[in-house]
């Protein structure tokens, strides 16, 4: 009789565990999401046991039928963990034994440990999860691309240090948020190559002596290969840390987009109006329309960063191989996935319904002497060294500021007084449209270049969607 009913160990113990230990050890409140993966792995394990001569055909078929019944009951909620179940593995073994009996159900545990089980299930769950997250990220990219396509010629103030710098196209700025998100999806796709290695068959750490075939289980579960080193297979969680990093990076990239939207929606900027369905009000101030989605995106990025750093701290000092510390590996990653699955559709909805005040942005685009660089580059095209041209353009700004006028309002004599090459012809470039159109090198803000960037974003998104469906 086991001293620890509902768990997968106990024969060596005469008593226990203490209630406080049982409560501390319990993980079914978070690892139950692995149940479908556990059952799929158990079915593959039954087939491998049969191939190794450790099960008869009838025993294999009986286990598979019991596992199918258990899977159905898990799916509809009629089977769930009990308070006495330590983890998802023990709960499901209990469920299987209830269906096929202790003699047959007990045979399935041969040749496997919770150590290789959980490492495999975590990888399998995470491979599916990152595809869902990637799809959500691509939804935000699609919203950004749609807005960019809808505003192909709208000009806005480009900023550095949050100070007006140079005029840029709104579409150019929006696509600048799309590119890092696409890189995040590329990271998720690349991550899958390292996650697609199955630890199954590694046992507790030393491998199996029962003639089992780890490659067969790996293939059945959709992995690319089995692990090369059984100790590493059970102990490694760098795949979890890598995923947590990419999830945190997505949070950071969303936070930067959110910060722009928060600023743009203020009265002081006035670039955008938020859609009623994607904003909230105040309990006391009737006039308020608050960018809550953007603010929550900004806040959740800190949570995702915390999940990453917490996981790394858990991993940093563990000796090989498996240690119980690794029970703490899943909740941070599960939470990061859950937060992004909640956040991404909301951000996509927010972005897709933004209403831009293009007249307001165009009005602000030249303010702050944002065409000063155009003056300097105009002089360079006339043979003036850039260092000298930069000084001359700065002097022109100083003169215009002193008079409270724009650069285009300086008199010809004032211009040539600053530099003999700085003639009234410079006014040809002192328009925001001329400034934007002139920046037509690859990646620049000229409409022809931004149209190419839009095509790149859409083509890359389509390619990544296909890659993630494989």
UniProtKB/Swiss-Prot annotation:
Its main location: cytoplasm. It catalyses: 2-(N(omega)-L-arginino)succinate = fumarate + L-arginine. Gene3D superfamilies: Fumarase/aspartase (C-terminal domain), Fumarase/aspartase (Central domain), Fumarase/aspartase (N-terminal domain). InterPro entries: Arg_succ_lyase_C, Argininosuccinate_lyase, Fumarase/histidase_N, Fumarate_lyase_CS, Fumarate_lyase_fam, Fumarate_lyase_N, L-Aspartase-like. One of its GO terms (biological process) is arginine biosynthetic process via ornithine. GO terms for molecular function: argininosuccinate lyase activity. This is Argininosuccinate lyase. The lineage of its organism: Bacteria, Bacillati, Actinomycetota, Actinomycetes, Mycobacteriales. HAMAP family: Arg_succ_lyase. It is found in: Cytoplasm. Keywords: Amino-acid biosynthesis, Arginine biosynthesis, Cytoplasm, Lyase. Pathway: Amino-acid biosynthesis; L-arginine biosynthesis; L-arginine from L-ornithine and carbamoyl phosphate: step 3/3. Pfam families: ASL_C2 (PF14698), Lyase_1 (PF00206). Belongs to the lyase 1 family. Argininosuccinate lyase subfamily. One of its GO terms (cellular component) is cytosol. It comes from the Bacteria. Its EC number is 4.3.2.1. It is an enzyme of class 4 (lyase).
